[in-house]
Amino acid sequence: MDEHYRVLALRVPSEQHPPPVATLMARRRVRVLQSILDDVVGRAALHTFDGTSGVVLLPGGPHQHAEQVTAATAQRFDTAVFVADGGEAARADLPAAGRAATELAELARALGRPAGSYRLDDLLLEYQLTRPGRARDRLAERIAPLSTRPHLLAALDAYLRHGTDRKTAAAEVHVHPNTFSYRMRRIAELTGLDPADPAGTRVLAAALTVVRAG
C-alpha cells in the first residue's frame, strides 16, 4: 500500500426494485466503478463499494484523478451518486477518514441535496449539527411536534430554502399566502419558535437539519 491516499466515499440513493433486480444493478455499478478506476489510476486504486455505498482510495498522484472519478461515476452509473471528497490521509488515518467521508456523503443524500461531489466545507454547519450531544437532542425535541404534521414541515422547509420569502414558499407548496401565514403561526405555537423572528428562524433551520439527517 501507498503511504497516502485520497479518500472518496460514494453513496447512491435506495431504490425500490425487486431483490434480484437490485442485486444485478448493484453488481453492475461495482463493475463500472472498477472500470473507471482502472482507466483513471490503474490497479493501484482500492475500494469497498458494494453497489450502494463504499469508500474509494486513490493512491497519491494528480489531484484531478478524484475529479475524473467523480465525473465518470455521475455519467456512467444508472442513478444519482453522492461523492464525498475526504482529501488525502496517511495510511494510519484511513479508517477515520473513510468513516468521516461516508458520513458526509450520507448527510448530503439525507438532506435532499443535489447529487454530486461534496467536501466538508460544503456542509460544515450541517455536519456539526449532526454530531451527537445534548444540543442536537434538544433541537430534535423542539421540532418534534411537527413530525406528525408533514404539511407544516414542508412549509417550514420551503420557507427556509427560499430565504423566508413567504410568497415564493407558498407557491411551492401550492397554498394561498394567507394559508401559508397560518401554517407559520401554527409552527410558532407548536414549537415555541417564531419563524418570523431571526433567532427563531436560526433555531428552526438547525432543528430541521437534525431531523432531515436522521
Predicted features, each with a name:
Residues M1-G214:
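Cytosolic nucleotide-utilizing catalytic cores of signal-transduction proteins
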